[in-house]
Amino acid sequence: MYIFFPKLNPIIFTIGPVSARWYGFMYVISFLFAMWYGKKCSIKNKKIWYEKKIETLLYAIFLGSCIGGRIGYIIFYNFSYYSQNMLSVFYIWEGGMSFHGGLIGAIIVMSYFSFKYKKKILEISDFITPLIPFGLGAGRIGNFINSELWGRVSPNFSYAMIFPNSQNQDLKEIKKYPELQLLLDQYGALPRHPTQLYEFFLEGILLFFIIYFFSKKDRPTGSISGLFLIFYGLFRIFIEFFREPDPQIGLLKNIITMGQILSLPMIIAGLIIMYKSCYKK
């Protein structure tokens, strides 16, 4: 009735004490794709960035988004833990990144480049935006291989997936819904939405093509960035209804997730940018 999580090894290879993981590899290929696609796009739009500037910009944004993603996760999702375990802030191999924090980090970097090179920040973000969805999709594949960020329990969904490492969270579900005990006994874990794959499709594939086809024509400055903010925010809010809330936070007011709260300003900002770019004279 349900789909069992495939036996995927999150480690590609190990040399001595060092292990190369698929999740980290997804960051690498995302950066390489951004470098390749960014240079390809620059051929059509040399007035914005030349090749050397593109490399510098992408290196800086990659670093800024990684730092911002880490700080964002600490502040938005687990501040109480990290405030008492300061050294754990640097244990990035244990996971803990926030897209919204990474976005803030990238905006800070783009603001600096905007000031340095005397270009509008929306010109820079319009150039960067088409490079983002591939990385989002690759990251979700990394999450899937790690068997993390799975969805909520869904016993009535035939294509729900059995994630073997969800058992600790499953036991909490059993306390609230004792009738699920039979499923836990039968399958060893409760069936859940494979939300990593949902996000891979919506944020990675679908969003990539939306931005790709929209940006093929000349658009008003800021409209590409605005469109990305709107659709990412909508997709993220939608998926959060199926995704298991972070256990240390849960549902805020038993209604909304942190991811949904952080995505709402993205939609509002995207609408404002689109309006000012396309309709305001």
UniProtKB/Swiss-Prot annotation:
It holds the Pfam family LGT. PROSITE patterns: LGT. NCBIfam families: lgt. It comes from the Bacteria. GO terms for molecular function: phosphatidylglycerol-prolipoprotein diacylglyceryl transferase activity. Keywords: Cell inner membrane, Cell membrane, Membrane, Transferase, Transmembrane, Transmembrane helix. It is found in: Cell inner membrane. It comes from Buchnera aphidicola subsp. Acyrthosiphon pisum (strain Tuc7). It is a multi-pass membrane protein. This is Phosphatidylglycerol--prolipoprotein diacylglyceryl transferase. The lineage of its organism: Bacteria, Pseudomonadati, Pseudomonadota, Gammaproteobacteria, Enterobacterales. GO terms for biological process: lipoprotein biosynthetic process. Pathway: Protein modification; lipoprotein biosynthesis (diacylglyceryl transfer).
